[in-house]
Amino acid sequence: MTLHADAVRTLSDWTGPTSHESALREEYLAALRDVSATSRTRAAGHLTASALVVDPYQRRMLLLLHRLVGLWLPMGGHCEPSDRTLADVALREATEESGIASLSLLPGPVALDRHPVPCRPTGNSVHLDVAYVAVTPPGAVESLSDESLDLQWFSLDGVAPEPTDDAVRRLVERARMLLPV
């Protein structure tokens, strides 16, 4: 199966928990009528994947301070030719940006978000992001990559750090509901 086919299947099978995300799902599926929708070269907007990295043992989440947008965000980014699924994209990005090996994804996407970004090579573009939750192994140690200004653990039960955005707050709420207390 190709990444494009997986994206169509994943989004077709996903039920948006809100009317806003149901509308986003339809927008993503419309974008996927163009086979280049998983490529960063598509200026009209392209699919990306992200993962909120959580440590369920210490009830904490790992966020990065994004170099370009200056917000605390989950790990995530563009699809690469070697990726076979959206889950692969999310897991690869989470591993690269957190430095944590042996992450595992909870099943299925947990949120969708559409956001404008300064994106190479197209200049300003739109990311059609599919978000997952990645779980750390016990005793995981993070490592800052050169893509971020900072990398920090925050309480999963506290408020999301500032500055961030509503999509991150929604993702954190969903992660809380998926993890055992």
Protein language model regions, located:
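Conserved Nudix-box catalytic region and its N-terminal flanking loop in Nudix hydrolases
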Residues: R59-I100, D157
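Predominantly extracellular/luminal regions of secreted and cell-surface proteins
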Residues: M1-E27, S98
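Acidic, metal-coordinating catalytic segment for phosphate/diphosphate chemistry
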Residues: T15-S50
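Active-site segment of metal-dependent pyrophosphate-handling enzymes
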Residues: G99-A140
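Short, well-ordered beta-strand micro-motif
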Residues: V53, V133-V135, W153-S155
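Histidine-centered active-site/metal-ligand motif
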Residues: H46, H66, H78, H115, ...
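NUDIX/MutT-family hydrolases
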Residues: E142-E173
